[in-house]
């Protein structure tokens, strides 16, 4: 899958732009804060119907404007896909595939396989379990439609149970809780098994990439931790119901699952250096790329934002060698350093386009 042309209107600081890309390497050069990341986020949004960070749709619209548009043409072998997205203040966003609007945005997930490496990924290591679950959920959802549907059903039941907990009247019967707890139990078990299987299948690829980039004297691991490891969710929800009424929310379930990121048998957030953290995250994302290909998806688009920051020259060199392999398809790389650009272009020897980004204006350098 490659993106051939994109038109952007009023998306973040990009007021207007129409760009055609190389099917291989697209290098975005410019100072920090000029709009390089915003272009990558636009491409990410077209793939996932949401931005890479936690901004609301209204925050994506350019200042003093009331709408934003993303319009792109993709090529997958001999097929052309036209994707349109319209965002308006205080209105529901519109996503269209080949001029036909989606009934559900979830139908779009997986059509444009995409992997993004971003400085914001450090949140997966440094902060709570939500970011780590989101990584796994977005990955699995790209190749497993049943997983995404089941996750939606689970979250709907979770919201209903939380509503009952916040408004628990003495007259409220246990049967009303059981309706939603049964749905959570059934869907939660499916999600648990799929996350467990994913972790087992994903780990070898992850280790392979990490040890290719880094020192083999380090050991890494990825552990899936769930309340369902020892109990059924339906039983847990029943046991915790009275306590949850006091708390006002559901304290147990697959929405509390976590993935332990381990380095030398310790949580990496406690012992990892900035370089080790960055290497860990890059290996995760490159493994995600290969995993999606293994699952039969088109070759993903790879978005690499500020890739070389906090990495020593040795690791940078190894990553460049990896990216130069024919395994990878279309790649977008942002950087402030022209030396990195020259180094990459010399070693990759692929077709490329170079763009200069300044104050939201993007122009190709011929």
Curated annotation (Swiss-Prot):
Q: What is this protein called?
A: DNA replication and repair protein RecF
Q: Which PANTHER family match?
A: DNA REPLICATION AND REPAIR PROTEIN RECF
Q: Which UniProt keywords apply?
A: ATP-binding, Cytoplasm, DNA damage, DNA repair, DNA replication, DNA-binding, Nucleotide-binding, SOS response
What broad taxonomic lineage does this protein's source fall under? Bacteria, Pseudomonadati, Bacteroidota, Bacteroidia, Bacteroidales
As for family, the record states: Belongs to the RecF family.
* InterPro entries for this protein: DNA-binding_RecF, DNA-binding_RecF_CS, P-loop_NTPase, RecF/RecN/SMC_N, RecF_2
**Family matches, as SUPFAM superfamilies:** P-loop containing nucleoside triphosphate hydrolases (SSF52540)
Q: Which domain of life is it from?
A: Bacteria
**What's this chain's function?**
The RecF protein is involved in DNA metabolism; it is required for DNA replication and normal SOS inducibility. RecF binds preferentially to single-stranded, linear DNA. It also seems to bind ATP.
Localization, per the record, is: Cytoplasm
Pfam families (alphabetical): SMC_N (PF02463)
Gene of this entry: recF
**Which residues bind ATP per the record?**
30-37
**Which Gene Ontology terms of cellular component type are present?**
cytoplasm
Q: Name one GO biological process term.
A: DNA synthesis involved in DNA repair
Q: Which GO terms describe its molecular function?
A: ATP binding; single-stranded DNA binding
